[in-house]
């Protein structure tokens, strides 16, 4: 390999890949992955790793064979296992002359703009020094992640990190080749989907039918991660980490796994922060007409298109936008509080004054303060 197509890469290493299905870390597999990453760094690629495996490492250290369901017990194992995991990575990268750093994040770390920028600046500084940063969600305090909440898995965390550092490529490596037309463990005739230009409802249904017993993230969360990454202008690939030299092949542009094509629009820093969805105070559900106008034409959201507001938020807060089916449309800065929106939803712009005794303009969310995913 003489040249790589991507200059800044986030690599997510899943539990199923790192354990090989045994529940214990596979040191040979980890050594080979680290070798590939080291070779890529020698070619000038900046790399951040989002690594699962802390709880698995803790189980192995303590000789615990069963998968715990109790949250405090999982947190204990994560605390024990995280140091083991970092020690393994340090030992594996040291022969290649590389230093590793640990980055433990929680959603609250990135939920405000200053925290987001501080984390970004730290990661960029580490990359500039040639350090391999190993990122994980802080399982010891991140209750949502331990409980396998939808937004707290390492798949989505890897997409957030790719968003954060403006990566060119997000590699989600697991024990399956990519997204299939049906679950290949149940349907041998299933075929690999090699390229995705748009994440449709049909693809989401395919992902929901797949299975993964070891990690917190199945194919559904990988698809969610791919959506965030591509909306942020990042190419995302889901691939089998067992394929020989898979990291080097994908970084060189070879066709393996399922490749998700990024949006042509490259969002700016503020838009990327909004896209992360970490700073939302509530949500606004819109009707089908408004959803179409937002998706296809990037129009401002008017009160007439609003069906309801959920949560408690004020003017100037960032909210999530959903369609009438609950599907996420994007994020925006609202001109009206949740209380005011409950009064003006469905109304035409000329009716707002009479209801509120004054208004903040016809737009509930102006298109300049809106990002569509």
From Swiss-Prot:
GO terms for cellular component: cytosol. GO terms for molecular function: ATP binding; glutamate 5-kinase activity; RNA binding. It is found in: Cytoplasm. Belongs to the glutamate 5-kinase family. The keyword Lyase does not apply. The keyword ATP-binding applies. It is an enzyme of class 2 (transferase). ATP binds at residues 12, 216-222. Keywords: Amino-acid biosynthesis, ATP-binding, Cytoplasm, Kinase, Nucleotide-binding, Proline biosynthesis, Transferase. This is Glutamate 5-kinase. Transmembrane segments: none annotated. Disulfide bonds: none annotated. Pathway: Amino-acid biosynthesis; L-proline biosynthesis; L-glutamate 5-semialdehyde from L-glutamate: step 1/2. It catalyses: L-glutamate + ATP = L-glutamyl 5-phosphate + ADP. Residues 281-359 form the PUA domain. GO terms for biological process: L-proline biosynthetic process. Its EC number is 2.7.2.11. Substrate binds at residues 52, 139, 154. PANTHER family: GLUTAMATE 5-KINASE, ISOPENTENYL PHOSPHATE KINASE. Catalyzes the transfer of a phosphate group to glutamate to form L-glutamate 5-phosphate. CDD domains: AAK_G5K_ProB, PUA_G5K.
């Amino acid at each position: 390999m003489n040249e790589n197509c991507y200059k800044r890469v986030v690599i997510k290493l899943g539990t199923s890949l790192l354990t090989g299905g045994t529940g214990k870390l596979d040191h040979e597999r980890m050594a080979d992955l680290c070798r590939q990453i080291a070779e890529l760094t020698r070619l000038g690629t900046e790399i951040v790793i989002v690594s699962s495996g802390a709880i698995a490492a803790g189980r192995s250290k303590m000789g615990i064979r069963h998968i715990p369901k109790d949250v405090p017990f999982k947190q204990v194992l994560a605390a024990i296992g995280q140091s083991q995991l970092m020690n393994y990575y340090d030992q594996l990268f040291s022969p290649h002359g590389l230093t590793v750093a640990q980055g433990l994040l929680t959603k609250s770390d990135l939920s405000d703009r200053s925290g987001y920028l501080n984390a970004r600046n730290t990661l960029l500084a580490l990359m500039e020094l040639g350090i391999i940063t190993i990122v994980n969600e802080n399982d010891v305090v991140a209750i949502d992640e331990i409980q396998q909440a939808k937004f707290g898995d390492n798949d989505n965390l890897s997409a957030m990190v790719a968003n954060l550092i403006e990566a060119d490529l997000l590699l989600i490596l697991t024990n399956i080749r990519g997204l299939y037309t049906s679950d290949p463990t149940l349907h041998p005739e299933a075929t690999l989907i090699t390229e995705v230009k748009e994440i449709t409802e049909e693809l989401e249904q395919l992902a929901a039918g797949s299975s993964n017993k070891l990690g917190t993230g199945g194919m559904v969360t990988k698809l969610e991660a791919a959506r965030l990454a591509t909306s942020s202008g990042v190419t995302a690939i889901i691939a089998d980490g067992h394929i020989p030299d898979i990291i080097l092949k994908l970084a060189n542009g070879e066709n393996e796994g399922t490749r998700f094509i990024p949006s042509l629009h490259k969002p700016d820093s503020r838009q990327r922060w909004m896209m992360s969805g970490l700073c939302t105070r509530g949500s606004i559900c819109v009707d089908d007409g408004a959803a179409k106008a937002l998706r296809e034409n990037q129009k401002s959201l008017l009160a007439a298109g609003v069906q309801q507001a959920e949560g408690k938020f004020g003017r100037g807060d960032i909210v999530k936008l959903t369609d009438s089916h609950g599907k996420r449309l994007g994020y925006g800065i609202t001109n009206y509080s949740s209380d005011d929106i409950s009064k003006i939803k469905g109304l035409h712009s000329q009716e707002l004054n009479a209801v509120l005794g004054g208004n903040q303009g016809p737009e509930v969310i102006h298109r300049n303060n809106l990002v569509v995913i």
